[in-house]
């Protein structure tokens, strides 16, 4: 992961595994502790990235103990940093919990409709966002107004 720190590429971090290798996925408290101990350098890089990049949490929960600790440490040690974002279906996180996430972890919640029940609306929204970002990049490159 370190080689990507100086890269202009976007990075998808699958901190606790991927469905492509389910045997390496992390679910239990013991597995979290073991991973934190055996991958200490990863968590140091994660600490740095939290301070220098904007994170969008997508397809995960809000109760990951390692991520909670990392975000809370950064929030209280370095006040005034720009927020990170957590994307979830409407109604899955209460208004009070959203306030707690912002106050303690500097996370703003972005909600989307999930009428279908299979999150297809999220995919549509992400595709639309991608098109808008591409258009804006072209506009900025042509006008040099950044």
Task: Identify the role of each PLM range.
Residues 1-9, 20-23, 43-146:
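SIR2/sirtuin-family catalytic core signature
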Residues 9-32:
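Active-site-proximal helix-loop elements at catalytic-domain edges
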Residues 27, 31-44:
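Active-site glycine-rich loop that binds ribose-phosphate moieties when present
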């Amino acid at each position: 992961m370190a080689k990507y720190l100086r890269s202009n590429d976007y990075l998808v971090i699958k901190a606790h595994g991927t469905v492509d290798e389910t045997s390496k996925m992390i679910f239990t408290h013991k597995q979290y502790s073991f991973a934190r101990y055996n991958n200490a350098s990863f968590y140091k890089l994660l600490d740095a990235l939290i301070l220098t990049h904007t994170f969008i949490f997508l397809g995960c929960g809000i109760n990951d103990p390692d991520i909670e600790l990392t975000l809370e440490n950064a929030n209280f040690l370095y006040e005034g940093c720009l927020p990170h974002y957590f994307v979830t279906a409407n109604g899955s996180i209460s208004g009070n919990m959203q306030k707690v996430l912002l106050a303690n972890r500097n996370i703003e919640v972005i909600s989307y409709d999930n009428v279908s029940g299979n999150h297809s609306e999220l995919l549509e929204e992400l595709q639309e966002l991608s098109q808008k970002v591409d258009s804006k990049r072209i506009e900025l490159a042509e006008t040099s107004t950044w």
